[in-house]
């Protein structure tokens, strides 16, 4: 009788150990999943919103730009944006900016100083958070973005295609520092018509991003 009872207790103990090991292995496997295979809890609408301000320089590429000195094509570039992250690796933002463009006549004989404004909506994808194991304490990410928008100058308007890449570093729960390279293509009629079917603008900026209260995500239980 005692031997039978001991055997039952031993079998139950072994089953418990095996189950615990399986749970540990399952947790380890789950922790090793990349971000795109990880499920996250839905966050409230007002969580993970951010605003950012960047400042730098851009260069205008159009007819006769290659005939001018590169330094003469460069102008100041301010950019402001507001957006929301929907999970750790993707989000949307609305970005706007403006300033001056330096175009040129034939043989760069004279410079055209033109003011413009633009606005675009971008899809943003964090590559490291997408491919690497999800880590809420991760400091660094590389974020390509692509979007569409519009541009205006005096009485001219144009549809724009916008894209680039951002490197960001998490300073604190509320602040990120970032460096961003971006480019924009728009209609040739915006400046000096002729030559290229489209004109372009390329810029390099640096700035900060502020996250409102409620930043972060929780993995969804299985």
Language-model-detected regions and their locations in the chain:
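Short glycine/proline- and aromatic-enriched beta-strand/turn motifs that initiate or cap beta-hairpins
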Residues: 20-83
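Residues on the lipid-exposed face of transmembrane beta-strands in outer-membrane beta-barrel proteins
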Residues: 53-57, 80-84, 121-127, 146-150, ...
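Short loop/turn motifs that connect adjacent beta-strands in outer-membrane beta-barrel proteins
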Residues: 38-48, 89, 128-141, 171-174, ...
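Cleavable N-terminal export/targeting peptides
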Residues: 1-44, 214-222
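Residues that define the transmembrane beta-barrel architecture of outer-membrane proteins
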Residues: 47, 70-78, 115-119, 138-140, ...
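Gram-negative (and chloroplast) outer-membrane scaffold detector with strong preference
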Residues: 88-161
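Predominantly the C-terminal beta-signal and adjacent terminal strand-loop region
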Residues: 101, 105-109, 170-222
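Residue-level detector of the transmembrane beta-barrel scaffold of outer-membrane proteins
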Residues: 50-52, 91-93, 141-145, 176-178, ...
């Amino acid at each position: 009788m005692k031997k039978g009872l001991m055997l039952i207790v031993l079998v139950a103990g072994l089953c418990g150990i095996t189950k615990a090991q399986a749970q540990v292995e399952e947790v380890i496997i789950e922790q090793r999943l990349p971000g795109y295979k990880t499920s996250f809890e839905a966050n409230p609408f007002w969580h993970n919103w951010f605003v950012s301000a960047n400042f730098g320089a851009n260069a205008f590429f159009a007819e006769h730009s290659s005939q001018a000195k590169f330094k003469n094509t460069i102008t100041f570039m301010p950019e402001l944006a507001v957006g929301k992250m929907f999970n750790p690796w993707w989000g949307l933002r609305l970005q706007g900016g403006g300033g001056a463009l330096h175009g040129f006549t034939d043989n760069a004989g004279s410079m055209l100083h033109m003011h413009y404004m633009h606005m675009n909506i971008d899809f943003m994808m964090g590559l490291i958070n997408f491919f690497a194991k999800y880590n809420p304490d991760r400091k660094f990410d590389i974020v390509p973005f692509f979007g569409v928008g519009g541009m205006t100058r005096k009485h001219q308007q144009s549809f724009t295609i916008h894209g680039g890449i951002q490197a960001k570093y998490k300073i604190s729960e509320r602040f990120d520092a970032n460096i961003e390279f971006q480019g924009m293509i728009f209609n040739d009629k915006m400046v000096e018509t002729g030559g290229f079917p489209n004109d372009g603008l390329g810029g390099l900026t640096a700035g900060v991003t502020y996250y409102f209260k409620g930043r972060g995500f929780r993995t969804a239980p299985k």
